[in-house]
């Protein structure tokens, strides 16, 4: 005779099996592989932009005076970015949102072309929404911000050329956002 615990285990496993009922996985197409590789690359970009936000807006008075001395090649660029802090913040926010939305679209394309969820709407939601949100938060926000908060000046000096480029690239959007 089986115990009550075995009955509960069987019921739990049946519910878990029902969650995966009708789910099929197919080999990813070349387009799907490119999409997921681009998404991973953009996840690094998201982390870079998020880290830049913390680094540029967390510089200490000592860091700022060191930047004013201009000992490093990026110091003038950092000063120029900080002198237009509203536009800097607008550029960072626009860049981060653009990258994150693109990551979500690429991952949706990848999952839609490789995993067919059938009637498993809950599993589809869990995989695409919860897992993707977790990855974006962990690798695109939290970890990069922790690193840059501990290395503000060093990170700003490395990030200044790329952020200056983004400032120019998103200039029409950031300027219109500031003047709203």
For the regions a language model picked out, list residue spans one by one.
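Membrane-embedded alpha-helical segments of inner-membrane proteins
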Residues: 9-178
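Short, small-residue-biased leader/transition segments that mark boundaries at the very start
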Residues: 1-8
């Amino acid at each position: 005779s089986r115990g009550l615990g075995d009955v509960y285990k069987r019921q739990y496993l049946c519910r878990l099996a029902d969650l995966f009922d009708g789910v099929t996985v197919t080999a990813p197409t070349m387009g799907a592989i490119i999409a997921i590789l681009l998404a991973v690359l953009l996840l690094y970009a998201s982390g870079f932009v998020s880290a830049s936000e913390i680094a540029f807006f967390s510089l200490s008075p000592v860091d700022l005076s060191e930047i004013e001395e201009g000992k490093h090649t990026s110091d003038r660029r950092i000063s120029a970015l900080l002198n237009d802090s509203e536009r800097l913040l607008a550029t960072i926010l626009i860049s981060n949102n653009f990258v994150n939305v693109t990551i979500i679209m690429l991952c949706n394309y990848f999952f839609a072309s490789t995993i067919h969820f059938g009637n498993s709407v809950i599993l589809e939601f869990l995989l695409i929404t919860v897992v993707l949100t977790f990855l974006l938060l962990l690798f695109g926000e939290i970890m990069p911000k922790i690193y840059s908060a501990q290395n503000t000046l060093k990170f700003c000096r490395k990030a200044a050329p790329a952020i200056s480029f983004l400032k120019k690239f998103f200039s029409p959007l950031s300027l219109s956002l500031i003047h709203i």
